[in-house]
A protein has these predicted regions:
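Alpha-helical structural motif
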Residues: 6, 10, 17, 166-169, ...
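Cofactor-pocket helix-loop regions in the catalytic cores of large enzyme subunits
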Residues: 22-36, 188-203
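An N-terminal, well-structured beta->alpha segment
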Residues: 1-45
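Glycine-rich phosphate-binding loops that contact phosphosugars or nucleotide phosphates
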Residues: 42-198
Length: 203
């Protein structure tokens, strides 16, 4: 039996992750440095992350990192499906400039993501699109855009590499937020970046 009998888009993406890790982390670090001014991030005490499909799962998976690196008295970190966030979130009570609303979407195309970001803008929250498409509706709606710069791949579906990119971007943001707010020691961002590459290479 030949190994190539088991070749498929998902297995190809799985096997590509160790090689993807370093350029993905570098790309996300570049995007993060250009995303939100540090004086804006320093005010953040509440974070709401939303997405659809694998982006929603990335939002959920990233919450422990935010709690670990940026958790402090009075802080709150939550996630929600984009449709639920758009319908049921009381944006007027989030905290205005002290609240960061992140819409995660590689394509930046889902209407619900843009709707959430638009409502965040309306109520004075800090809105951020974490995406790989700077011309997307989400990027154009959000006050700030965090481009993760995921390298191209012959077959982008299913979205495993996009999920990896979204989660990497969120992890790095959590570490940077922790550094800026004094919840984590200097070097937390650098340490997170190195750990992401090292751990993925060990797969």
């Amino acid at each position: 039996m030949e190994n190539n009998m088991f070749d498929n888009p998902l297995s190809s993406q799985c096997l590509s992750l160790p090689e993807l890790a370093k350029p993905q982390v570098e790309g996300a670090l570049l995007g993060l440095s250009q995303a939100i001014p540090e004086d804006v991030l320093k005010k953040i005490r509440r974070v709401l992350i939303t997405g659809c499909g694998d982006s929603y799962v990335a939002a959920q998976a990233a919450i422990p990192a935010f709690r670990k690196f940026a958790g402090r008295f009075g802080s709150q970190f939550s996630y929600a499906r984009a449709i639920d966030a758009a319908r049921f979130t009381d944006f007027s009570s989030l905290g205005g400039e002290n609240a960061l609303v992140i819409g995660v979407s590689c394509s930046g195309g889902p209407a619900r993501i843009s709707e959430v970001l638009e409502r965040a803008n309306r109520y004075g929250c800090v809105s951020l699109a974490l995406t790989n498409n700077p011309e997307s509706p989400a990027a154009k709606t959000a006050a700030y855009t965090y481009l993760v710069h995921t390298p191209e791949f012959p077959n982008a579906n299913p979205g495993l590499r996009n999920y990896f990119a979204s989660l990497t971007g969120l992890y790095l943001l959590a570490a940077k937020l922790g550094e800026l707010t004094g919840c984590s020691k200097p070097g937390a961002l650098e340490g997170m970046a190195a750990a992401r590459v090292e751990n993925t290479a060990a797969w």
